[in-house]
Every structure is written in C-alpha cells, then in structure tokens.
C-alpha cells in the first residue's frame, strides 16, 4: 500500500491496474484494525473517499480512546503495568522504554487525519493537480472550499457547492511553472483567466482531460466553465466549540459512594 502513499508511485489513474486493484482490495479488511496507519491517505490517493472518511472516524472514535490522543497500552497491559522492571521493547532491543498504562500517539493522529483530509481535497502526485478527488458521499450536500499547496509550487484554491459541483478553481503560481490541472468538469469546456486584468490565458487540453497553461511567478489565475462568472471571495465561518462545565463531586457525595 505504500506504493500509493507515501511513495506516490500510483494514483487514481492506476486504480484499474493490477497493482491499483491490489491496493484498493487491501483497504477492505476489518474496520478496527487500521490503528494510526495512513489508511485515510492511501484510500484518498486511490479515489476512495468513503473509505478514507471511514478510517478517519475509526481512528478517532476507536483507536484514539481519549481526547488528548492517549490510547491504552495493549502490549502486556495490565499484566506488567505494576512491575517496575517492565519495559516495552521497540525496534528489536534498540529502543527500550518503561511500560506505561497509557501511550501517547504523538504526531501520528494529527498527521494522519489532517493529511488524509488534505488528500481528499487536493492531490498533485500524478504530474497534475486534482481538486476534490476523493470527497465522500456524506459530504456531497455540504459546501466546501480549501486553499492548499500543490507540487510544482502552486497555491491552489477551489470551491464546491451543496450540489457537489465544483464552482471554480484558483491557482497562484509561486515559481512560474507550467500548470497541469485535471478538468474538474469532465469533458466540459472551460477557460483560464489572469486575475490581474481578466485576460484569457492560452490553454491546451489533452486527451486525458488535463488542462495545461503557462504561468508567471506571482500571478493568480481562475479556472472556470465557459459562460460562468468568476465568484467573489467568500468567507466561511464555523461555530465555536461548546464549553461544558464539569463539577467535581462534593465530599459528601464521595462518602455516599
């Protein structure tokens, strides 16, 4: 599975190949066996948005047992937890740590889940940029947008409405490289405009539906369907986290228990 992520040797275009089918098939094991493993990213790289979301939820709800990222020590707990001489043997005796009842998963949860979501929104590992390549069906009625970096030194933004339709794509060129974008509207004709003056940019469309256009360093471009208007900037707001007040039991309540 590493051939899809992190190696990036195959992707959505290889989904129907023998190797691609093998990777997709390996994602079908027991839902609760992924632990903190990059299954969300692997699933997204193969265009399996529903599977990616499933493993993200599973990692948070099942494997990561506590809000701060702690999980139970499943290597001998609770048999050896009270043995002061007990150690956890890692990397074949090259890394020994004292046994604890809890383990901190470190950066794994955050990096896995955040990177997984990023890969669901944007991919650029196949020599081209894809926007919304692996959005799960559960999000089809949710408007969404992102701004992420893509390979080739491009800052890419894109928005999608509540009908699961891409409304427009924005590209800021940081190094003036050739931009190759998978047409997010399939075989529909689209155009590229330079934001500074609204001038149309020459675009070449390949047989694989990839739009290729030259860029200049620091310039911003909008990719849109022909006949549609460029959308104005939209600010998205989220609801603040709900604060819950927990009170400790009184000494009297403790005595009763």
Model-derived features: positions:
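Short, well-ordered beta-strand segments enriched in hydrophobic/aromatic residues
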Residues: 156, 166-173
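Active-site core of glycosidic bond-cleaving carbohydrate-active enzymes
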Residues: 1-125, 165-167
